[in-house]
Amino acid sequence: MSKVIGIDLGTTNSCVAIMEGGEPIVIANAEGSRTTPSMVAITDSGERLVGQQAKRQAVTNPENTLFAIKRLIGRKFESEAVKKDIAISPFKIVKADNADAWVEVRGQKYSPPEISAMVLQKMKKTAEDYLGETVTDAVITVPAYFDDSQRQATKDAGKIAGLNVLRIINEPTAAALAYGLDKKKDEKIAVFDLGGGTFDISILELGEGVFEVKSTNGDTFLGGEDFDQNVIDWIADEFKKDQGIDLRNDKMALQRLKEAAEKAKCELSSSMETDINLPFITADASGPKHLNLKLTRAKLEAICANLIDKLEGPCRTALKDAGLSPSDIDEVILVGGMTRMPIVQKRVQDIFGKVPNRGVNPDEVVAIGAAIQGGVLKGDVKDVLLLDVTPLSLGIETLGGVMTRLIEKNSTIPCRKSQIFSTAADNQPAVSIHVLQGEREMAGDNKTLGNFELTGIPAAPRGVPQIEVTFDIDANGIVHVSAKDLGTGKEQSIRITASSGLSKEEIDKMVREAESHASEDKKKRELIEARNQADSLVYSTEKSLSEFGDKIDAAEKQKIEEGLAALKKAMEGNDADAIKKASDELMQASHKLAEAVYAKAQPAGEEQAGAAAHEGEAKGEKVVDADFEEVKEDKK
């Protein structure tokens, strides 16, 4: 079996590592660097340049040099994040036939996975040159808060690059593997990962070779590229004030600004002041113009204050989801080049109340972790168990527009959950399964991942057919959903593909709205549940009354009819408590009728009912009623 390589496919830079002699080793590229710029350029002759070669010619070829493509992967063209990128990008971002965001270079369209594949091919070649043999198997990392479509698109990029992607793992988890492999003591750690394009925070428990992720959060549109953009805007604004020329309108000048901004940002991590000198940046009728500015660390921190402030929210949420306070965290591991900024380190210290651990190389640690995971999968690394989580809840839409969750956020993956649903109407021949991802109570407030139908259900009263819906998340975090009619054995399934992913803005919006609308959502849900239960009660009472009404006296029958009328009236309103009260009163009034039904049914059905009850107990099934109203069993 050939070697398994670990690849950190980064927004700004990528890195590749392997396990050799039981130790992870980062491999230097042909240019002698241990990291490779995630850049691709197409020259006049159609030649593809990747990495440092692409970066070197970016100033003279800005429209055909692609960078930060990871921010487009698995995203729709119409998303706010993509619109923001279009406004500042020197290259052309276009709408694909499937509504995804693609790029156009020299008249040809490329999908983000295609461009990412070019970077992956460079990493593959780097490993092959070092090993002297062909490499096919790889573990590739993604931000922990990447959604289903982004993970799928990353896997597709690996396939395009000729790699057999054994596993997609989360970047903070990979970093934790690299940090904790030789640690013997049990500890709780926070991995703070601020890279070129994304921000992740993961809380893990380490002990006895087990790496268990307790929670994860983040922002897939916050990273070094955004810090660079703030600096670019400041430089351009200063120059415009001085010369009256907006350099953002000149793509070649803009590319020079980008390089200068990145260089200044890096220099200010170790010095208090830097000069930005760009001679012959542009020209007008009066002659050439030169740019010369001083930028201090304090000014840089002020320019980027709005981005620094965005780091705290996800950290607090991750701690809350893990059920921990900052004082419970033993170590905070810094990952990603942006964590070299002193202001970022200070903010991390303020959030967690302790000095962060800088014992790992923030640029290489993720690739090292990916290589370790490759070693685990190949069997070279023993006694290591990695337990990762899914970042968002998954479920389906049920009667009344409610989202019924099958898998909660921060559930350990891989995982599989099933629940039994039924039909909402008599003789219903098909059910539509609406697959959702998000944290809101109502289906319409969450993100649709897909829709499919289970047809050919035999005619039967509502509530009788049993439809088992199963959610399956694999170790890569990719979702599969199936629905099966337990009566006929007929099954239909859907694999959520890259075209139906979820953007980061939508995730953030969902979480924020979920918090602000929590009580409102709860009331809506309670009202719908009360209505659903009342509807079932009305249906069953009317059915029993028509069949067994002659077995009870007229006064009892009148009480039931009055109770039915009162409940129907209550159901027209929006008061859940009133509906529950009317339901209870109808149930009280129906006691005599229930006795008549029971007396009639017992002799004929006692044996059968007993058997069915035992079978249900054995399976421990949780049945949800036809109209997708949950019928809760007592907890066992």
Swiss-Prot record:
- Tell me what induces its expression: By stress conditions e.g. heat shock.
Task: List compositional bias (Basic and acidic residues) regions by residue number.
Answer: 614-625
The encoding gene: dnaK
Q: Where is the composition biased (Low complexity)?
A: 602-613
Task: Look up and give the organism this protein is from.
Answer: Geotalea daltonii (strain DSM 22248 / JCM 15807 / FRC-32)
Q: From the UniProt entry, list the residue stretches annotated as the region Disordered.
A: 602-636
- Say if the entry is tagged with keyword ATP-binding: yes
Q: What is this protein called?
A: Chaperone protein DnaK
Instruction: Please indicate if the UniProt record lists Phosphoprotein as a keyword.
Output: yes
Would you say which domain of life the source belongs to?
Bacteria
